């Protein structure tokens, strides 16, 4: 009987133990399920929140956000991420149960009874630590997807791409040679401020995407630059970015910029600076009227802003693109805050040639009466000789000079027209020959301006053997008036978007900005084909530039595809006509596309009116009126005897100016455009 009672006692004990163990295991599984469910809910909501524009850097597991319903592709991506987390959680639960059963079995083998032994559950913190890798990976993937969907032209949240500076080595001319290093970019973590230029950015590497198709290459390249959509002029001369896919510049060739200096810290320009910087403005500046000028030979600070604007047209490689992104530029400062002198420019030409620059850009000039006499019995022939001597010196050194035509709507071949114009500013006793210098010389490439349709800019001078590139127009400004010109967005397609000495960007117009496009294009030709003779280089340019309305127009794709004509100086006219016909077709297609885009944008702007209040219209009108009148008054000084002036206008807007909020109107307009475009896409 005792044996039977003992056996029954053991059986009852085992049954009670199994019951307790089962309840403990079920409790553990329930806790694990709750934790994983909570984890999934938090992460799914955090990811969904990021699709609404959240800037949270990490997933917050402490508070839940309501789910967002969407019919977009983003919802599918989020659902996929949630499924991944569910699957991962299920695996984790099975692992936890298996581990717990092993622990319980071990304890059970050591003792006859576990009725007083409780299983220790895995803590929530431990579970979160084990799932950290899964959560982080999912978050990174989701952020990448969302980042790719963001609108590039958002001035508030854009991150500029900055070209990574590879290891440098100097060639015989002292130019930095980075050609052996692959092209790469760095993406700034900090955002460009409207009030403060970018400095000392922390960056992370971003690889360059490569495609087998030229069209895809161009698209990938240009899409990585936030403000490409606002550069109608660059689209025109590059065939919508095709030239970037055809050839990317090395660091073997440099362009010398004779201008007002440069903002060295500008993120779009800082990685393009060469080894040569020279200030040729003497102490006291122009006519000793600039007390801030110290004569420091290494001072290249751009007080005027013009040099920085010009440099962006050549080498910008960040939020915007120049015609030759990243190509080396050397700086020769001849302007303080206003005007320059011919002897300073002549010295700069010689210095730039000595420094090995194959192309020398001069977006400035003056009118010289080289015969006849003024009231004092003299003329400008000596200044003419100063230019001629310097240009001959540069040509002999293998450098070609590119200079801007004036912005006075003059036919420089009509001397009477030139005389009549000059009489408005100078007292002429005996009229003589008037020239537009330094663009007048045979060895110089003279550059005029066109608008987005290939027509000569309403302000541009014209001349024989000149080449034309986008410089903008003021036709709509004069036609519609100041208020409508801004409110309907004409300036977006009439003026040019370029780098400014604020560290940001600015809208400008003038032949000053057609000239650097030609300079940058010539630098690409020299870099690709190795043409060293300046006269041959000029002929190559003219032979490979299509005629539009009887004028030679810059087309960089044609230049980069013109190798067979590089040394064919006796090409027959039939071949020229065939090539020009093809080039004209390309340009016509580009112009037609641009016109359609402009018409659509103007119509859209009319309907939406930019959502800008009337007070913005009034402010912009005042800004334009004041600046336009100032520029007209400055024309008197620019055309005074002995003065060299820049050949551009900067009216609206000066973005990023920390001293005046009013000119930031352009940023407001473009930001609103970006929002409207994103809404349209959604």
UniProtKB/Swiss-Prot annotation:
Residues spanned by motif LPXTG sorting signal: 652-656
GO terms for cellular component: extracellular region
Group of enzyme by EC: hydrolase
Pathway connected to this protein: Antibiotic biosynthesis; nisin biosynthesis
PROSITE patterns xrefs: GRAM_POS_ANCHORING, SUBTILASE, SUBTILASE_ASP, SUBTILASE_HIS
Protein origin, superkingdom: Bacteria
Modification Pentaglycyl murein peptidoglycan amidated threonine, positions: 655
Pfam families documented for this protein: Peptidase_S8 (PF00082)
Keyword Disulfide bond among UniProt keywords: no
Membrane topology: Peptidoglycan-anchor
Gene Ontology biological-process annotations: proteolysis
Keywords assigned: Cell wall, Hydrolase, Peptidoglycan-anchor, Protease, Secreted, Serine protease, Signal, Zymogen
Enzyme Commission (EC) number: 3.4.21.-
Subcellular compartments: Secreted, Cell wall
Residues annotated as the enzyme's active site: 259 (charge relay system), 306 (charge relay system), 512 (charge relay system)
Domain Peptidase S8 span(s) in chain numbering: 231-566
Residue ranges the record assigns to the propeptide: 23-195, 656-682
GO MF term list: serine-type endopeptidase activity
Signal peptide start-end: 1-22
Cited function: Cleaves the lantibiotic nisin precursor peptide.
Family according to the record: Belongs to the peptidase S8 family.
Database matches in PANTHER family: CEREVISIN-RELATED, PEPTIDASE S8
Stated name of the protein: Nisin leader peptide-processing serine protease NisP
Source organism of the structure: Lactococcus lactis subsp. lactis (Streptococcus lactis)
Gene transcribed to yield this protein: nisP
């Amino acid at each position: 009987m005792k044996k039977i009672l003992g056996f029954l006692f053991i059986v009852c004990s085992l049954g009670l133990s199994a019951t307790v163990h089962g309840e403990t295991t079920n409790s553990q599984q329930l806790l694990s399920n709750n934790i994983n469910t909570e984890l999934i809910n938090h992460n799914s909501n955090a990811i969904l929140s990021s699709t609404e524009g959240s800037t949270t850097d990490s997933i917050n597991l402490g508070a839940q956000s309501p789910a967002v319903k969407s019919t977009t592709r983003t919802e599918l991506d989020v659902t996929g991420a949630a499924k991944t987390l569910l699957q991962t959680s299920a695996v984790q639960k099975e692992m936890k149960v298996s581990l717990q059963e092993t622990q319980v079995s071990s304890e059970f083998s050591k003792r006859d009874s576990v009725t007083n032994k409780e299983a220790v559950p895995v803590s929530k913190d431990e579970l979160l630590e084990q799932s950290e890798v899964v959560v982080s990976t999912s978050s990174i993937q989701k952020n990448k997807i969302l980042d790719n969907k963001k609108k590039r032209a958002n001035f508030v949240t854009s991150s500029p791409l900055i070209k990574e500076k590879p290891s440098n080595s100097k060639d015989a001319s002292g130019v930095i040679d980075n050609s052996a290093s692959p092209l790469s970019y760095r993406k700034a973590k900090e955002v460009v401020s409207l009030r403060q230029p970018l400095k000392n950015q922390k960056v992370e590497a971003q690889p360059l995407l490569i495609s087998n198709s030229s069209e895809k290459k161009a698209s990938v390249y240009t899409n990585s630059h936030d403000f490409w959509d606002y550069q109608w002029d660059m689209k025109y001369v590059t065939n919508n970015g095709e030239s970037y896919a055809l050839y990317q510049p090395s660091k073997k060739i440099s362009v010398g910029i004779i201008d007002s200096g440069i903002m060295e810290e500008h993120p779009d320009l800082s990685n393009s600076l060469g080894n040569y910087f020279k200030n040729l403005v003497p102490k006291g500046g122009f006519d000793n009227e600039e007390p801030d000028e110290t004569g420091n030979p290494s001072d290249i600070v751009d007080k005027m802003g013009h040099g920085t604007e010009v440099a962006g047209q050549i080498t910008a490689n960040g939020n915007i693109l120049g015609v030759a992104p990243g190509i080396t530029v050397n700086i020769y400062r001849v302007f303080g805050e206003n005007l320059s002198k011919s002897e300073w420019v002549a010295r700069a030409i010689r210095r730039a040639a000595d420094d090995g620059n194959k192309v020398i850009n001069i977006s400035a000039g003056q009118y010289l009466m080289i015969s006849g006499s003024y009231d004092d019995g003299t003329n400008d022939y000596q200044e003419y000789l100063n230019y001629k001597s310097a240009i001959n010196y540069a040509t002999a050194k293998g450098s070609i000079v590119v200079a801007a035509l004036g912005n006075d709507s003059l036919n420089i071949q009509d001397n009477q027209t030139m005389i009549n114009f000059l009489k408005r500013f100078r007292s002429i006793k005996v009229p003589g020959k008037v020239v537009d210098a330094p663009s007048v010389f045979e060895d110089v490439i003279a550059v005029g301006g066109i608008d987005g349709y290939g027509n000569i800019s309403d302000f541009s001078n014209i001349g024989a053997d000149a080449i034309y590139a986008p410089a903008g127009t003021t036709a709509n400004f004069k036609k519609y008036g100041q208020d409508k010109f801004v409110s309907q967005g004409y300036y977006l397609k009439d003026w040019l978007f370029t780098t400014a000495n604020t560290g940001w960007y600015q809208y400008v117009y003038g032949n000053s900005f057609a000239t650097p496009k030609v300079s940058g294009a010539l630098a690409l030709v020299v870099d690709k084909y190795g043409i060293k003779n300046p006269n041959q280089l000029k002929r190559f340019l003219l032979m490979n530039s299509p005629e539009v309305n009887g004028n030679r127009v810059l087309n960089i794709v044609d230049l980069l595809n013109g190798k067979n004509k590089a040394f064919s100086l006796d090409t027959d006219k039939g071949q020229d006509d065939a090539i020009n016909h093809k080039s004209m077709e390309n340009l016509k297609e580009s112009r037609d596309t641009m016109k359609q885009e402009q018409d659509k944008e103007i119509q859209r702007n009319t309907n939406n009116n930019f959502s800008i209040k009337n007070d913005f219209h009034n402010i912009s009108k005042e800004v334009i009126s004041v600046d336009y009148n100032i520029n007209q008054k400055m024309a008197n000084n620019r055309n005074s005897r002995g003065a060299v002036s820049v050949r551009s206008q900067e009216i609206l807007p000066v973005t990023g100016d920390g001293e005046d909020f009013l000119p930031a109107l352009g940023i407001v307009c473009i930001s609103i455009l970006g929002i409207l475009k994103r809404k349209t896409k959604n």
